[in-house]
Amino acid sequence: FLPRLFEGVESKMSFVTENVSWWFAKNGQDDDIVLSTKVTLCRNLADFPFIRKMTDDDKQRVDSLIYDAFCQEDYSFFYYDSLSDSAKKVFIDNNILWGNCSSVIINNKDDSISCLTNQSDHLKISVFSAGFECEKAAKKIYALDEKIQEKLQFAASMDFGYLTSNLCNCGSGLKISVRMFI
């Protein structure tokens, strides 16, 4: 099933390697000090165990459900295991992923939105922006989250909020970070 999803990966990879992080070239608030803003949401699908307890079948089903949620939009899909070493390095250098994984990487055209499946949580959504743009990036990620929730049901609790594999990420599942030039 997965190889069929990612036909043409090499042609899409030329986009990633030739046009690295278009969002970074844009101007942002206080961009002489704050180089970039990254807002991340961690989500897990309801009715699936957390990553450490998942079978390979579970992971494929999660990948498939997430693919279905994003395929109507203008995103590119990359299966980590099928990427060349240089393409993996591009994703690592762009702070999209780290280390070895077997994730599916989902990017929009300018790489300002990047998602990973089945790494530490079922879905990790990141929005990148040049400069100090926390509010702008947060609005963008929440809009995407609402759109995805029309198609996917996330694990949540009235007492604890969104459930994640890391207790620090439970609740809103939101993390905001900035990269600064000091």
Q: Which residue stretches match the model-derived regions?
A:
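Long, Pro/Ser/Thr-rich low-complexity/intrinsically disordered regulatory tracts in eukaryotic proteins
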Residues: F1-D159, N166, L174-K175
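Short glycine-/aliphatic-rich beta-strand segments at the starts of folded cytosolic domains
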Residues: S172-I182
